Amino acid sequence: ESHNIPEDLKIIDLSMDYRIKSDDHDFIYGLPELNRRATCTAKHVANPGCFATCIQLGLLPLAKNLMLTDDISVNAITGSTGAGVKPGATSHFSWRNNNISVYKAFEHQHVPEIKQSLQQLQNSFDSDIDFIPYRGDFPRGIFATLVVKTKVALEEIVRMYEEYYAKDSFVHIVDKNIDLKQVVNTNKCLIH
C-alpha cells in the first residue's frame, strides 16, 4: 500500500533499508559521532544498527587517522533485546538461559554499513572485517573485542581516541577493564 508523505515530514527510519548510501534516497546515516552536523539538519535519518554502532565507535578514530591497513577481527556478544521484538526459537529466555551461541558468522548484515562509514573517513579502507556475533545470556547491551594490527604506541592511540571523542558526551575512553553493567540501561559506550 502506498501513502503520501508530506515533503516537510522528518523521518528517522529504524530499519536497515536506508543505511547504505544510494541515489535512490536522501537518508543520512545517523551516527552522530560520524555525521553529527548532517544528522542534525537532515529531514531523513537512517538509524544505525546496534552491532554497527558498537563496532564503528571502536574503529572510527583509527579510520580518521588512516590506520586501518589490514583485516579487522571482531567478536561481539549481544543481549536478547538485540534480536528485536519478533519471537523466535533463539530469542526466548528458556533457550538463551545458560547459553551462548554464534550466528551469521562472517556474513552479518551490519558489515556493509560499517565498511561504508570507515571508508567515509579512510577512503583507502578495503580490508575484510571478520565479524563473529554471539547471542548472550543477558537481556541488554553489547560487549565487543576488536583486533587491529598497528605499530603505533598505545599512548598515541589513546590520545587519538580521546581527541576524536572529546565533544561526544556518550563515548568514554577508560583506562580500566570494563564490564557490561557499566553501560546497561544507559546510552553510554565505554572504550578500553
PLM feature spans:
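N-terminal Rossmann-like NAD(P) cofactor-binding subdomain of oxidoreductases
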Residues: E1-A105, N123-S124
